[in-house]
């Protein structure tokens, strides 16, 4: 997607709400009225209809008319709409916000600790990435959605890996975590990934990892960095990018880029999808969207796709996560009803229906929801996206963590991780100079 930029991240946090919602969902009683939502427009046919159905069910029970506008993310229209509504102080009651947009608009959003803490009480721990993006100065300002939220693990052609790299990915990561062999899983490291990528490159089927300024590029590179222990800036605002860990990760990225298609530096978020669907590529790092499109456009490719965990680095196994959030504008006249609706659509049964409607693309932020049958049953082949939810030792990550959100938002939106790699690999700049440049960029983020 296009990068969303601004001069400054807004600084003011809204006051906290102390009330904690009871564990079970209990509908409220509201005066007749309307509740309007501006929602991310899903790319999966029928997914919007399922969300509309859930909202209408709640509306009929509570005698509230629910109006939904589905807003495309093409050209960042959803973010531009949110920015316009925040400035005008008028618009929808509830708005969806991608990546760092909760932080951007936090002083215009109602604190919703009661909703999120109630869900945590029901379902247990929530994604650390969701907390990093939406819990600001101790208070939740957004509810993680099921709709559109995603992680970006490996999606690989298991036939090509077996033929040309000698790896049976379905044997390493079968569609049943109980059957995983720890020794085989532990052997799936970045060194193993590189060795297989080199063989696939020689065979004429390179992996396709973008290195532009799109979110897909930033997310996979950030997961690589995290697995090597790279820290851009710590929570105390100390710049840490000049480290042995950074140099190790950059060298691995350099080696991977050497066996990648040369045009990956210009790819947008659709580039890696097109690469896999074309049949030319052996693998990407992405949600199962490419597989879903291939089912129609190139069935032979889809039949040989297998989603599985990311490679492991010296500091662990990490996968990029990109949640979407619901936020309630402070100007909303029906905030109580808005909170109740968000609680309803966040229930496990609601999430189950939404995941099914998206063929497993949508990923809730609660690990307690990772047992849905959809990931076990969608095909072809059966089990192809079972490993899409993080399982085993795979942890979610977000670029910039644990730096202060105002810094990480700029780091993400300006694609600092991929620009670093591009300077080093495509630009042939010296590694020390690239790291020095990145440190200067981080200093600049602190001043804005």
Where do the language-model regions lie?
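Paired acidic/hydrophobic, glycine-rich loop segments that form the ligand-binding mouth/hinge
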Residues: 93-96, 282-286
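Short helix-initiation/N-cap motifs at beta->coil->alpha
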Residues: 71-81, 187-192, 264-278
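C-terminal capping/gating helix-and-loop segments adjacent to ligand/active sites or protein-protein/ligand interfaces
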Residues: 65, 381-443
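Short, solvent-exposed loop/beta-turn-alpha elements that line the ligand-binding surface or hinge
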Residues: 114-127, 167-186, 228-249, 296-299, ...
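Hinge/lid segment of periplasmic solute-binding proteins
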Residues: 98-155, 159-162, 304-311, 379-387, ...
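Glycine-centered hinge/linker elements that transmit conformational signals in sensory
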Residues: 190-201, 235-266, 310
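Conserved N-terminal structural module of periplasmic/extracytoplasmic solute-binding proteins
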Residues: 2-5, 9-107, 116-124, 149-150, ...
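Extracytoplasmic/periplasmic substrate-recognition and gating elements
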Residues: 32-36, 56, 60-62, 135-138, ...
């Amino acid at each position: 997607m296009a990068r969303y930029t601004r001069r400054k991240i807004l600084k003011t946090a809204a006051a906290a709400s102390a009330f904690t919602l009871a564990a079970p969902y209990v509908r409220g009683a509201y005066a007749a009225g309307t509740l309007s939502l501006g929602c991310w427009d899903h790319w999966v046919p029928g997914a919007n209809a399922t969300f509309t159905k859930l909202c209408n069910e709640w509306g009929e029970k509570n005698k509230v008319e629910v109006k939904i506008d589905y807003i495309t993310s093409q050209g960042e229209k959803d973010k531009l709409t949110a920015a316009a509504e925040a400035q005008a102080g008028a618009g929808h009651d509830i708005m969806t916000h991608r990546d760092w947009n909760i932080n951007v608009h936090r002083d215009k959003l109602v604190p919703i600790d009661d909703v999120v803490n109630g869900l945590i009480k029901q379902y247990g721990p929530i994604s650390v990435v969701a907390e990093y993006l939406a819990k600001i100065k101790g208070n939740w300002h957004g509810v993680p959605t099921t709709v559109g939220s995603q992680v970006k693990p490996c999606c690989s052609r298991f036939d090509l890996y077996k033929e040309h790299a000698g790896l049976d990915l379905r044997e390493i990561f079968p569609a049943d975590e109980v059957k995983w062999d720890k020794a085989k899983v532990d052997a799936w490291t970045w060194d193993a990934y590189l060795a297989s990528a080199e063989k696939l490159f020689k065979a004429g089927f390179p992996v396709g990892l973008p290195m532009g300024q799109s979110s897909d590029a930033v997310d996979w590179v950030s997961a690589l960095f995290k697995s090597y222990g790279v820290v851009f800036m710590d929570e105390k605002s100390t710049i840490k990018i000049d480290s042995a860990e950074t140099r190790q990760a950059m060298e691995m990225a350099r080696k991977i880029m050497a066996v990648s298609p040369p045009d990956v530096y210009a790819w947008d978020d659709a580039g890696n999808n097109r690469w896999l669907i074309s049949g030319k590529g052996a693998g990407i790092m992405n949600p199962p969207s490419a597989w879903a499109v291939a089912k129609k456009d190139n069935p032979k490719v889809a039949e040989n796709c297998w989603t599985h965990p990311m490679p492991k680095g010296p500091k662990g196994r990490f996968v990029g996560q990109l949640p979407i959030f619901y936020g309630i504008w402070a100007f909303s006249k029906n905030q109580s009803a808005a909170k109740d609706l968000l609680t309803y659509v966040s229930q496990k049964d609601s999430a189950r229906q939404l995941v099914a409607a998206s063929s497993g693309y949508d990923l809730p932020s609660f690990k307690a929801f990772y047992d849905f049958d959809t990931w076990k049953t969608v095909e072809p082949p059966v089990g192809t996206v079972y490993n899409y939810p993080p399982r085993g030792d795979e942890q979610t990550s977000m670029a910039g963590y644990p730096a202060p959100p105002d810094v990480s938002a700029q780091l993400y939106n300006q694609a600092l991780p991929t620009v670093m790699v591009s300077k080093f690999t495509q630009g042939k700049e010296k590694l020390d100079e690239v790291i020095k440049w990145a440190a200067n960029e981080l200093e600049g983020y602190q001043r804005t």
